[in-house]
């Protein structure tokens, strides 16, 4: 949902003008281009139609269907010179069966067979051969081949040698045609065999047998193609992107077709012919799915694998004039083209590519920022001063409270600190309790003569969801801009040295929402250019902007550990402690405000959780370093401070964390019977480890006791707990059933029900093939339970 813009709109009757305005804002809107072209053709303003077609085809230059529409428009007005110019433009840049058929039809129409004779026929044959060489391998090219055969069959020779020439030409066309797996190849084969038999039954079997092998391969290929594409592959242009379900489905079909071609199921001996087929399919895929960067990337990658030096310029042209014209905000294609320019020693062109992407992303970022500002302005109306009497002390106290309640972003300290955000205040007439009583201790004190309600947030759930959506999009764009600047800076260092990289870094810092990663990468570039003092200055500069960003500070700490700067490490830990503690306190105060919608509350809680998580991680990293390279006194000092900050945490977790082998806490695993992931002190779960956790095995193992094996004491304890739970279950059943036993309960009994309700479900133990469950101990456990029904 977008906020309406305050701009004048054209009258609804002016459809053409409105479409033109919309296309000025978004020139990649394929559907609106088609609507505009159709409207103009109806209006029949020739110059306007031509201008619109020209503008459209500069962007969608490969759209064969639109070229056909443009040419037919000119043919209807008998503009032959214009038509020929259009054919010259389009036939070199797009491969389209219907466009080639239109070209051949035009050549036949302007050729005088009466006076031209054999020469005129030769011109048409050349046109057919041109079209066949261009699109004859297309699975939909049957109509073009049939046109060619029918044209040759319509020739009425005057001499015997001309008759034989006609037969040879037709047989030659059939020979090429029947090796192509077209849609109705079986019908075409029947047509060919009938022609041979009618021509000369004595020689028919000879010619037919010569082609039957290739025909069988083509027919098998056609069957396989229909199977892998479910007969659902669409060849027309799809204006959707990778988020569109239909596009995802079509992409799957195109990739399957490409794999089929690469497998060479037609058993083509000439590799150049097979390569031509593969490239043709790649082209058709980019025509059908122009807004899917993956297709463009893979096409270029294929060309470079086949012949890197020979296809370098073609790859650059393909991305510059095709992929990035249609996907100007694609990081994938931008970085691919930038690398190609760099390999071609054309870094100035690479700079342009990077800057174009930054401009496009910045434009979108500014648009989202404006939408956020308008939304906040709408949901934060000015306080009615007539109903609230405030003296100077009140104003000062409010300012202090606002400064104490700075609102960070959704990542819990993972982004740059922002100025104190403006509170969304409750209108005096809209308070929850309708009184000026104190609410959760948050009411601002006021003189006894003043009537004042607590200062709280006021935002509807719908507005909160919309704001969250905008903020997520803003974060996505901020990350994309940061990534682009980082890679631009690194590429500049490779090509032009550290000074040019510094210029990019300086430019990146002008973006107010630049990510912390740019500081880390810039510092590392300086470090590996033997500028360690400069690297430290950059890290220090980043620390000022990202004082509560856990990810930045962890990277900073890693760097300080690498260069063994103990004093700065200690300073970073101490300042981070103070900054994080203050920020957590501010957020906790905000949580006390009334009328917080669930989304905002969850957002604040997430920020607090993340801040605590990263503060723990910082302490853990430094304590581990101190225990390894400094002294136990330093280690104990910081460990004590950490335990004071997080008194509810198990001290064993912190202690054993510095006694890991690689990243495995063997002590907890072998001696305490705990999963290292579940009790990890830093609270950060690696995705691979998380999957391992879901599939963990319950086995004794060889030579060691299992963390989850039951000994005799554990069994007794488990039985006792189950007996207690059984009593509760039995009571609930008695109340529910009122003395009437259900069949399933009389079979298993309340003890088993209690046990099963206490155990986790089967998926908790992983796949059946991976789990090891001791059935004997389970039977022993069941046997010791009371209230087991007898058979």
Curated annotation (Swiss-Prot):
Subcellular location: Nucleus; Cytoplasm
SUPFAM superfamilies, per database record: TPR-like
Residue ranges, compositional bias (Low complexity): 427-442
Location of region: Disordered: 379-449, 725-745
Source taxon at top rank: Eukaryota
Acidic residues bias spans: 389-411
A Gene Ontology biological process term: mRNA 3'-end processing
Gene Ontology MF terms in the entry: mRNA binding
Protein name: mRNA 3'-end-processing protein RNA14
Organism in which the protein naturally occurs: Candida albicans (strain SC5314 / ATCC MYA-2876)
Phylogenetic lineage: Eukaryota, Fungi, Dikarya, Ascomycota, Saccharomycotina
Gene: RNA14
